[in-house]
């Protein structure tokens, strides 16, 4: 039987926090939210990722599922785009205008793909 305290602790361990637009980007394998210091949400977005890693530049963030194939792109107002890649994501970086560069592992080849802020 899992107690509430154990579930709360697991959530804290899997949740990460980064500064974005002077606020806090809170993200986990289940979703992301931009919150203030009281944890009141400006926006939230649900997704499923095994190993989410965020990169932030100014008002833009990308959350990539490292070793997976999905990325979510956010600005200060919420989700701007979504990407599903053909190969496993090694690393993703975002520019201050929302352009995403991703290194993908294609087995015998390594790819660097670029995506606009809407995921195209």
Predicted regions and their residues:
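Short, positively charged
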Residues: 11-14, 36
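Short, intrinsically disordered, charge-balanced linker/junction segments flanking boundaries
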Residues: 113-120
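Short beta-strand elements that form the blades of beta-propeller/WD-repeat-like
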Residues: 15-28, 32-33, 52-66, 71-72, ...
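Short coil-to-beta transitions that initiate beta-strands within beta-rich domains
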Residues: 6, 11-12, 43, 48-51, ...
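Domain-scale macromolecular recognition modules
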Residues: 31, 35-36, 44
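A short beta-strand motif characteristic of beta-propeller blades
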Residues: 2-9, 39-46, 77-84, 120
